[in-house]
Amino acid sequence: MNPTFGASILSWIPPMWTPEAGLFAIQQASAAGFDLLEILLPPSMEFDAPTVKRQLKQHGLKETCSLNLPKEAHIPFYPKKATCLIKEALDKASELEVDYLGGVLHSGIGVFSGKQRTREEENMLCEVWAEVAEYATRSGITIGIEPINRYESYMCTSAEEVLRFIKCVNAPNLSLHLDTFHMNIEETSFYEPVIAAGSRLRHIHMTESDRGMLGEGNVRWDDLFRGLQEIDFNGNLVLENFSNSVPGMAEAV
C-alpha cells in the first residue's frame, strides 16, 4: 500500500477558480506538505492550464482533477450537455497532463425527478459513461465516479450502485471514487465497499461526518484503512473539508 496524499482546493478556496485563489491554494497545499492538489474544475473550464501546471511544478505538487455536474447537465434530463461538459473537462485535464478525472459524474447535485431511478435513466447513464470513457482513452485518463448521499442525488448513492453500472459499461478506465462523508450516510460499512471495489478504487475524499477535523466525528477510519491495506491501495487519499473561515465557502456549499 503506497497511496498519494493530497488535498482539494476546497480546503482553502471556494469552488469558483480565479488565478489569485488558485495560486493561493497551490501555495497552501505545498506549505502543508501535501503531495497532490485536486483541482475542482469550474463548469466554464476557464483557467490557463499551462500557467497552473507551471505553478504546481514550482511548488512540488502533483495534480488531479474533479468535476461535479451542474443542474443543467443532469444526465437523465440533458445527456448531450453532460457528455459535452465531461469531454471538456477531460480536455482540460489533458492540458494539465493528469491521468485522473473524478467527481459527481452521474447527475446534477440536488436534482430530483420526484420518482425512483428508472431503467431508462440507468441505460442513459451507461451510454454517457461509455462514450466519455472511450473519449478519455485518447489521453490516458481514468474516470472516477463518486456516489453521493440520497439528499443530493437519486442516481448513484452507494458504491454498489456505481460498481454495478461500471460493470455494465465494461470500460477499463472507469473507476470508483469514494467520499467518507457520503459513505457515513449511505454505507453500512467502511470496509466492505473498499473490498468490493478492489482495483477499481482509485480515489477517496477523506472527510469527517460533519465535514470537520478528521477523527472527531463518526467515520470509522480503522475499518476504512483495514480495507485499503487488504486491497493494497495505491491511489489518492485527498482531504476535502469545508471551513467557514474560507470567504464565500458557506454560500458556495
Q: What residue spans do the PLM features occupy?
A:
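Active-site acidic/histidine proton-transfer and metal-coordination neighborhood
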Residues: 19, 58, 77-175
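Short amphipathic alpha-helices and their capping/turn segments at secondary-structure boundaries
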Residues: 46-59, 85-97, 126-134, 191-196, ...
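Conserved H-loop
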Residues: 62, 142, 234
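Conserved beta-strand positions in the central sheet of alpha/beta enzyme cores
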Residues: 38, 65, 102, 144, ...
